[in-house]
Curated annotation (Swiss-Prot):
InterPro entries referenced in this protein's UniProt entry, alphabetically: HD/PDEase_dom, HD_domain, HDIG_dom, KH_dom, KH_dom_type_1, KH_dom_type_1_sf, Ribonuclease_Y, RNase_Y_N
Species, as recorded: Thermobifida fusca (strain YX)
Keyword Transmembrane part of the UniProt annotation: yes
Main location: membrane
Family membership: Belongs to the RNase Y family.
Protein's name in the database: Ribonuclease Y
GO molecular function ontology, one term from the record: RNA endonuclease activity
């Protein structure tokens, strides 16, 4: 048994040896195949790398050749520019040398001319017995006098041309605007009459020991006049808004029949609210009539208050509406902004609603109100410039001035007191006499709309007469307030008298 086992073991070992040897041989052959394949791959990669390196080298060589050619071209251009710069520098050096030579020659000639001028001045001073300063002063005086005369002649020619062309067109535009406007004109006095249903009502208005009338005057700020005039009592106040409120208050008291201090206060409060509503409605009606749709409510209310204010007897709100129509029509004729011109003219006197409450002229106050309540700068400027307190810089501002003057200066628009009228005429005469010593007589004619000045012919020539007329007109514009325009006429008359015997 042991021998068999040994044989089996030996056989197994031999088989394993054979299998191992075969496997080793197979592995060796596979390794040789893999090595051959790897060698092929390596050869292929090496060939590809060599080809890529050669192509990259060729591309780099081509780029280097291109860069070298570009550098050569740039070097050639730089060399050409350097040559041009050198030539320009040589030319500039030559020109500088010539300029220095010319400058030296000019300096030499200037010195020579100065020497000759000094010699000539000395000769002239010796010949004329005048120093250079005295001769210069005399020459300047002659030139100034001649320039004044030439300027006066030129001004007269320009004014003549302006009158010939400008006045004709302005007259046509204003005439068209006036004839297209047909506005009503109303004026109020400081006294308002209130009718009574019966004469016995006067006693009830006065009250016991006059307590009702005192309470009425205290609450309303209006004087209540009860006299012998049958069927009416009078309300007197210079403030039109308070006067209207007092009128409504008294009418309510008379209609109710109960008149006592407590009832007076109640009626006054109701009337005050009613007047405020009337002011708003009046402002809205004015906007509707002019054709303006948007405006701050405070400005509308202030505009309505002007319904109860007058200027020289002219209702201010009616004047504003009339001015707005005139400004709009003139703007249309001139091709200007019609809505803006209407707005400027409608608001130009808005400051009069607060002149008794705020310090300052109504033009400045009105401009401040316009800016405060969102109006554009053109409107505010037209308001503050309509009385020349600020120089007018826009067409709308000038149209506002013209519309204001037309509306206030047309016949029947305003009335003035006799005292102010006489003072204005006297001031016109004083201005005319003060302008020149050559004024001999002054006549103010046509209710202050024309000033005729008689001058001394030996003291004033024709050119000076034109200057005197212009100076008088300018001072009248600056110092006086008047409706319409004032014409200044200077008359220079020469008479030669001889007697035959």
């Amino acid at each position: 048994m042991d021998g068999v086992a040994d044989l089996v073991v030996i056989a197994l070992l031999g088989a394993l040896t054979l299998l191992t040897a075969g496997h080793v041989l197979a592995l060796r052959s596979r390794s040789r195949a893999v090595a051959a394949q790897a060698q092929q791959w390596a050869d292929r990669i090496r060939a590809d790398a060599e080809n890529a390196a050669r192509s990259h080298q060729d591309r780099l060589l081509a780029e280097a050749a291109a860069y070298r050619a570009e550098l050569d071209r740039r070097e050639q251009r730089i060399a050409a520019q350097e040559q041009r710069i050198e030539r320009e520098l040589r030319r500039l050096d030559a020109a500088r040398r010539q300029l220095d030579e010319r400058t030296a020659q000019l300096d030499q000639r200037a010195a020579e001319l100065a020497r000759l001028a000094e010699e000539r001045r000395a000769v002239l001073e010796q010949a004329a017995a005048l120093t250079a300063e005295e001769a210069k002063a005399a020459l300047v005086a002659d030139i100034v006098d001649q320039a004044k005369r030439e300027a006066a002649v030129l001004v007269r020619a320009i004014e003549r041309d302006a009158r010939t062309n400008g006045e004709a067109r302005a007259r046509r535009i204003i005439s068209l605007a006036i004839q297209r406007l047909a506005g009503e004109q109303t004026s109020e006095s400081v006294v308002r009459a209130v009718p009574l249903p019966e004469e016995a009502m006067k006693g009830r208005i006065i009250g016991r020991e006059g307590r009702n009338i005192r309470a009425f005057e205290t609450v309303t700020g209006v004087d209540l006049i009860v006299d012998d005039t049958p069927g009416v009592v009078l309300l007197s106040c210079f403030h039109p808004l308070r006067r209207e409120t007092a009128r409504l208050t008294l009418e309510k008291l008379v209609a109710d029949g109960r008149i006592n201090p407590h009832r007076i206060e109640e009626a006054y409060e109701a009337s005050r609210r009613e007047v405020e509503q009337q002011c708003v409605r009046a402002g809205e009606d004015a906007l509707l009539e002019v054709g303006i749709s948007d405006m701050h409510p405070e400005l509308v209310a202030l505009l309505g208050q002007l319904r109860y204010r007058t200027s020289y007897g002219q209702n201010v709100l009616a004047h504003l509406v009339e001015s707005a129509h005139l400004a709009g029509m003139m703007a249309a004729e001139l091709g200007a902004d019609v809505p803006l011109a209407k707005r400027c003219a409608l608001l130009h006197d808005i400051g009069k609603a607060l002149t008794h409450e705020v310090e300052g002229s109504h033009a400045v106050i009105g401009a401040q109100l316009a800016r405060r309540y969102g109006e554009c700068e053109e409107v505010a400027h037209a308001i503050e410039a309509h009385h020349n307190e600020v120089e007018a810089r826009t067409v709308e501002a000038v149209l506002t001035q013209a519309a204001d003057a037309i509306s206030g200066g047309r016949p029947g628009a305003r009335r003035a007191s006799m005292e102010s009228y006489v003072k204005r005429l006297q001031r016109m005469e004083e201005i005319a006499y003060a302008v020149s010593d050559g004024v001999e007589k002054v006549f103010v004619m046509q209710a202050g709309r024309e000033i005729r000045v008689m001058v001394q012919p030996e003291a004033v020539d024709d050119v000076q007469a034109q200057v005197i007329a212009r100076d008088i007109a300018k001072r009248v514009e600056e110092e006086l307030t008047y409706p319409g325009q004032v014409r200044v006429t200077v008359i220079r008359e020469s008479r030669a008298v001889e007697t035959a015997r």
